[in-house]
């Protein structure tokens, strides 16, 4: 782990004066998009070297300063399975809680939920999947058993007035089972929604999706779950994350998950590379005239910070381009 240096200011030449293009030929697009920043959890969970707790806390604070409305802070999973998240309570207690910003945490079971609530969590997330093999490797149980675990979490969350977000993994393909049926994705999404999840994030966990697959999957899911309750979570393994996200926006989705500097992967999904970079998403949305409330300059600084801490290059094309200006 490299020592953390002060982030260098970037020259946003051509970005600060960026004008929105005409979108009349692109179909209806949302006027505003809620970005769910998953870098501190999904982005860091697969790092081999343990990231110091103060670095995680500072990253989240910088993302808050950038204006991101939702920042997934950590995961209350067993350190045996994900050692990187062993400091979950310290992270959640240590971050600054900015007014108007939500800091959800992943809670796969009742034990995790109880620990999260004790640490001050106000919103939690649960993970489902459309693949039996993936669920076995990721949660050590069947799909049906995973829903039984969620049921207890959902009941406890409702009793405590804590919001629950649901994830559907492998929505566009599975590393073990290959192609995934849109109908199966719709079935799992409907079940999570009917259990009380206020929002369902549809994840292309290994990044194999294309715009056509995204359209077919969303069409099926939207027959079962209101589009206002849907989000997309795209990995960029094959360079399709922005294209897939744009299709989702054109279909009415207005919530997008992304990760600063494109950090991320999945410890149980071989070949999965990083998430859609938040910097690239914000740049595209700015160009489309879609409001996000995110300060791109401060976001780039947060990306610089964590990449220096990890001693790695950013996966964000926008960060790479502005570094050369």
Swiss-Prot record:
Cellular component terms (Gene Ontology): mitochondrial inner membrane; mitochondrial matrix; mitochondrion; peroxisome; protein-containing complex
Organism: Mus musculus (Mouse)
Gene Ontology molecular functions: hydroxymethylglutaryl-CoA lyase activity; magnesium ion binding; manganese ion binding; metal ion binding; structural molecule activity
Modification type N6-acetyllysine: residues: 48, 111, 137, 179, 324
Pfam families registered for this protein in UniProt: HMGL-like (PF00682)
InterPro entries associated with the record: Aldolase_TIM, HMG_CoA_lyase_AS, HMGL, PYR_CT
Residue span(s) of domain Pyruvate carboxyltransferase: 33-300
Catalyzed reactions per annotation: (3S)-3-hydroxy-3-methylglutaryl-CoA = acetoacetate + acetyl-CoA
GO biological process: ketone body biosynthetic process; mitochondrion organization
SUPFAM superfamilies linked to this entry: Aldolase
Record-linked PROSITE patterns: HMG_COA_LYASE (PS01062), PYR_CT (PS50991)
Subcellular locations according to the entry: Mitochondrion matrix; Peroxisome
Annotated a divalent metal cation binding sites: 42, 233, 235, 275
Protein name per the record: Hydroxymethylglutaryl-CoA lyase, mitochondrial
E.C. designation(s): 4.1.3.4
Record keyword Acetylation present: yes
Domain of life: Eukaryota
């Amino acid at each position: 782990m490299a020592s953390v240096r002060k982030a260098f200011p970037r020259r946003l030449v051509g970005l600060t004066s960026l004008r929105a293009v005409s979108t009349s030929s692109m179909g209806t697009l949302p006027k505003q998009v809620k970005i769910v920043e998953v870098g501190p959890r999904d982005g860091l969970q697969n790092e081999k070297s343990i990231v110091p707790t103060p670095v995680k806390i500072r990253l989240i604070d910088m993302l808050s300063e950038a204006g991101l409305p939702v920042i997934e802070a950590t995961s209350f999973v067993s350190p045996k399975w994900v050692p990187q998240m062993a400091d979950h309570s310290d992270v959640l207690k240590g971050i600054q809680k900015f007014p108007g910003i939500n800091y959800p945490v992943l809670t796969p079971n009742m034990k995790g939920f109880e620990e999260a609530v004790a640490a001050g969590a106000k919103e939690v997330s649960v993970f489902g999947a459309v693949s039996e093999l993936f669920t076995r490797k990721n949660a050590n149980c069947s799909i049906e058993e995973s829903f039984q675990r969620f049921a207890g979490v959902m009941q406890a969350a409702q009793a405590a007035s804590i919001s629950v977000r649901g994830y559907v993994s492998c929505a566009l393909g599975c590393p073990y089972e290959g192609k995934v049926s849109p109908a199966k994705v719709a079935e799992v999404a409907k079940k999570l929604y009917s259990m009380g999840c206020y929002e369902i994030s549809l994840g292309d966990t290994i990044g194999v999706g294309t715009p056509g697959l995204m359209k077919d999957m969303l069409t099926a899911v939207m027959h079962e779950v209101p589009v206002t309750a849907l989000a997309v979570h795209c990995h960029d393994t094959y360079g399709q994350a922005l294209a897939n996200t744009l299709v989702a926006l054109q279909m009415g989705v207005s919530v997008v998950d992304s990760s600063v500097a494109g950090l991320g992967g999945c410890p149980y999904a071989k070949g999965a590379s990083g998430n859609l970079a938040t910097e690239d998403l914000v740049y595209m949305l700015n160009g489309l005239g879609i409001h996000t409330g995110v300060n791109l300059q401060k976001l780039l600084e947060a990306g610089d910070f964590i990449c220096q801490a990890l001693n790695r290059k950013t996966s964000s094309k926008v960060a790479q381009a502005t570094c050369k200006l």
